[in-house]
Amino acid sequence: SGTVGAAMEGFLFGIPSIAFSQVDKGWAEIEAAAATARQMVLDMKSQQLIGTSPWLLNVNIPNMPLEALKSIKLCRLGRRHSAEQAIVQQSPRGETMYWIGSAGAAKDDSEGTDFHATAHGHVAMTPLYFYLIYYYILGYWAQTASKLTGVAS
């Protein structure tokens, strides 16, 4: 998601980062989501849980009134089926535009996932880990790179 992408930027710059998202479409309970996010950050700060080492959290908040929200659950990520296909359209200026299709339906929404937690009214918190270098395959590419010229013949 774009929210996780933005938080990832902070993480990659060494900043503890949180991606807060409200589950489902609509803004009906955006105040409840904002209050929940604010309280989580204040709690982390007051309990000195933020620290200086970078970390990345994905937090999904159900779209429901504040009094209906349940506790925070630590979760793994659920999985989705593939997204719908992109839709090709023309802009008013005649340029080609691509609308990315809707996210796919849940493929794994079992207990322990963020999908399951939010479907049952809980705030889902998932620690993420992301680095752009695939360290486990560096050895392979070190050998392979020496066989490449990088110049068209």
Stretch-by-stretch model annotation:
Residues 1-5:
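Charged helix-capping and loop-helix junction motifs
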Residues 6-10:
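Hydrophobic/aromatic ligand-binding patch that stacks against planar heteroaromatic rings
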Residues 11-33:
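Glycine-rich phosphate/pyrophosphate-binding loops
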Residues 32-153:
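Electrostatically charged, flexible surface regions
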